[in-house]
Amino acid sequence: MLFRSGSVNPSYQLGTGSWDYLITADYVIKRKRFGLNTMVNYILKTENQKNYRFGNQTNYAATFFYFHESSKFTLVPQLGIAGEIYESNSQHGQTVRNTAGNLLLSKIGFEVGKNKFSLGANAMIPITQNLNAGNVEARYRWSINLNYAL
């Protein structure tokens, strides 16, 4: 995510210098070959050594999937939405203006598996956003993953 000036928002940098706590819930419902995976998590952020506290964050997602299984592999195409809600940052106990926001993304991807291995990829494109009073713009995201079941 970039400021319109081209610099990167500090809220999205690696490491906040604080201890943060994650509360998460995940639920999958499946009927025959169709399913829905839902997820919500809340990140409780604490103040760092510079008396700066990034705002708490809520993330959520709902992903529909279809499970196709053949004798050689499994294929699971996915389609859904994901969202993020950012509370305001604070410094020395004072709210930092224009640091809250929200983002809603569309999500498409797949997983392909064989034996204990699976490979997946997904892309996310913003549907609507209001980040840092419009000063930050989220662009597309993509990821790939490789898993091994123990």
Segments predicted by a language model, with ranges:
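Outer-membrane pore/translocation modules
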Residues: 1-53
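Outer membrane beta-barrel transmembrane domains
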Residues: 49-150
